[in-house]
Amino acid sequence: MPRNLSRIFLVLLALGLTASCTREPENAPPDMLQHVPADTPYVFVAGKRLPDGLRARLADHYAAQLAVQRAALLKVRTQLQASDEVAAATREAGDYFHVLDALLAEFEGRETADALRELGIEPVARSVVYGIGILPALRIEIADAARLDALLDRVAERAGLSVARSSLGEQAYRRIDLGGVDLVLSVTQTHLVAGLLTDAMFDRHLPLLLGQQAPARSLAASGEIDAMIKRHGFTGYGEGFVKLHDLTGILLGKGSGLNAEVMQALGAEPIALTTGCGALAETMTAAMPRLVMGITRADDQQVVTRGVWESTPAVAQYLGKLAAPVPGVGATYDGLLAVGLGIELPQLRNALDALLRHLIAAGSACEWVDRDGLEAMIPQLSLALGPMTAGLKGFNLKIDDVELDPDTLEPRNVRASLLAAIDDPRGLLALGAMFSPGLAALEIPADGSFVDLPQDLGLEDKTPPLKVAVRDRALLLLAGADDAGPDDWPRDAGTAAPTPLFAIDYGLLLLVERFGDLSERAATQLRSQGEIEMAEELTDQVAGFRQQARLFERQRVTLHASAEGLVMDQVMELR
């Protein structure tokens, strides 16, 4: 029971993360970060007020999401209980489900921000999530203390929780015994404070959690968040980090200060690794030591987030050589779906070769490292990523539109294109001609002009008419294009910078408008055929897409390398 009840805090943590937007104009507000120890291994802080219009829309969006989570939880629990693999674990986690159900019951029917505020919750609030050692803590602004207190009482009663009440000075708090650690909840006039504290260090760490005692050195004093904002172009609307290298050291028993103190109080033994394997783990995480994330733009048109897996200069140098420019990948797009990939395979081979050799050398004293197996993989890399594949750079697939038959749900019309970036596209066609007489007889100019692909190439009868063209180092295949010409080729200006390794762009609103009703019809058909579980999954997916499409019109994700490491940008265009 204690192990499962510890997940209560994860619920509160999730609520804090959904409220990761802000009230005050400062970037990293001292009143939040002054409570955070400078040596925390992780943090996410929301410290700057969003534009009012965006903030209001997000608040209603979050409320609508929370309002349907109880029904979603019931479905998940039912599915887990029906699974032979996890049914026993689901029964053991019954207390967790009771608490979560009790909490989510409070949100049912409250589909607006104003309705949530009636519970004392501010849907879009300044907040900070951090670690007192490795144990999580949360501080979040609230709408009404008395109403939130009443909510916590109802949840505890409905879930059958045993809650001890006490106070430190004039600050009241709830304490829930979870075994070796306790969950602490404190509602002040302006904040909800929550965290896990060890039994052994409870009296020592409680003032720190409640904000009555400052850490030896705070994250506000260190300036680390401000430096991170400047380094990665964040805005202060929300940013944070996870220090992978520090966490590895803590778990290996090499932490210091508060981190070591908490581990000792937990009675946690260091991870059982030999000296050699421990050194290898530290070496590997030192190469890419920190994950950072933050908001780079937020206005009435877009919300843009960035995640960076920071690396050493040596690793960044390898990463920087991987991307191959593929026309159109990552460029602005307004159709249903675009997905593309561009990788220099010889450079990928070099990077993997260097990684394997590093593992062999650094892991010589680690029994987990299969030296012979790794050495055998090196020549295999040269075969798989050798001269035969060196000319393959990547692709860009665009699905502009798909019309489905409402009765059979099969495609009636398709408008799409597939661009393959290849050093020798004509050589690829020649290779295909060896297996297809029809393709061998086809004359394809090298100037980018399109020709029709004959239907006798072994394609299925339902395949739409296809056209193919070759230009420079690219082959372009079109489907559903009656007239094709130079405008169907991606423009040079359409190639994104920096060069993406991967990109995906999809129109949420377009997908819902095109396929939402058809998907619901498909779910109805599945139910009539007895496929209840599949029908429910499809219905839930469509409902999720519809909810997202009420706020977001498009989403785009790109992955690229920089001098900082591996960077993922996500652009969410608002309706």
Named regions from a protein language model:
Residues 345-351, 427-430, 511-521:
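Membrane-proximal interfacial segments on either side of biological membranes
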Residues 8-18:
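Bacterial N-terminal signal peptides
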Residues 1-9:
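Bacterial N-terminal signal peptides that target proteins for export
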Residues 182-187, 279-282, 286-297, 390-402, ...:
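Broad, structure-driven detector of short, well-ordered beta-strand segments within folded domains
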Residues 21-175, 225-288, 303-406:
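Structural boundary/hinge residues at secondary-structure and domain interfaces
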Residues 43-44, 94-230, 390-501, 570-574:
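Single conserved position on a long alpha-helix in the C-terminal lobe of the eukaryotic protein kinase
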Residues 220, 229, 234-240, 502-504, ...:
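Signature of lipid phosphatidyltransferase scaffolds
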Residues 249, 259, 264-267, 271, ...:
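Long, C-terminal catalytic modules of enzymes
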